Amino acid sequence: INCTAYDNHVKGLGGGFGFQSQNADGMRAVVSNCIAWGNTCRDDDYGTGNANIRYGNAQTDGELPNRVTINVVCVPENTVSASAITSDPMFVDAANGNFRLAEGSPCIDAGDDPAIEGYDTDLDGNARIFGAAVDLGPYEVNDGSAIETAETNGGEIVRVQYYTMQGIEVTSPSVSGLY
């Protein structure tokens, strides 16, 4: 739930997410609000999906595809879910490990809110949900945050963000004075 798999290269199934079972009895897997982008895996004669999300069950009852639930995801090829987002997720700086979503990303406010029940914060500890719906991936975009900079007596620059007691970021605080 709410994860990103990026630029993985494997010899087995699914560079992003891969599911294989010799006996699928009782197995259930759910992929929801995730981004799988730029992953590769070997070509094989069995399996369903693509290099980013792939599942197969050689020598089983053929039920593995029925036991893997793919909810809202962002993948380059729409072969795993009718609701898949296939546009570039627009990471801030994937080359340097920043997988936060940039402004204009199709993954912002595109997730399945019920899937995150019980998970109130993102990987940075910021409140989920910010906006119309949960974002895909591990980071929630907090657009338009109220950020101020101030110079202290020592000449240091301080960044200030405002939050409610519930941890919700305030985008337009109406406060003044020294604290």
Where are these regions (language model features)?
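Acidic/polar residues in short coil/turn loops that connect beta-strands
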Residues: 96, 122, 164-166
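Active-site and glycan-interaction determinants of carbohydrate-active enzymes
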Residues: 80, 100-136
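Short linear motifs in intrinsically disordered
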Residues: 108-113, 146-155, 168-174
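Short loop/turn microsegments at loop-to-beta-strand junctions
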Residues: 115-117, 157-159, 177
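Residue-level detector of functionally pivotal "anchor" positions at catalytic/ligand-binding pockets or at interdomain
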Residues: 81, 140-166
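Short, surface-exposed loop/turn motifs with a glycine/proline- and acidic-biased composition
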Residues: 160-179
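Predominantly extracellular beta-rich ligand-binding scaffolds that present long acidic/polar faces
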Residues: 1-102, 117, 124
